[in-house]
Amino acid sequence: MKKTKILIPIYNDWQSVFKLLETINVQLDSWEADISVIIINDASTEERPNNTCLLNNLKSVHVINMRENRGHARCNATGLKYIFEKEDFDYVIIMDGDGEDRPAEL
C-alpha cells in the first residue's frame, strides 16, 4: 500500500484545520489508504483547543511547532524537510489549512 503524507501549514486557525481533518477523514472512508497528516504550526498565538474528533481513516496526525512565525512558504519547507528526513512515504500533498484546497480533489 502506498504511503501518503498530507502537509498542512497553520497559523491561528485551528477550527478550520480540525474541520479540514474531519472532511479528509470522511473523504477517505471508502479508500484503502495509508495516509498521515503533518501539521506545521507557524508559532500560532492562539492556544490549540483540545479536539477529540475521531479520525479513524488517518494513520496519524503529527503537529510540529515552529519557534517563531516564519510564514507559509517556510512552514511548507520545514514540513517537507521533516518528511524527507524522518518519514517513509510515496507521495506528499500540501494543503492549505483554511479549506481552500478541497479534500474531494485528493
Residues covered by each model-derived region:
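Short, well-formed alpha-helical segments that are part of the catalytic scaffolds
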Residues: 13-28, 47
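Residue-level signature of catalytic and energy-coupling elements of molecular machines
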Residues: 24, 79, 98
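Short beta-strand/loop segment that forms part of the nucleotide-sugar
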Residues: 33-44, 65-66
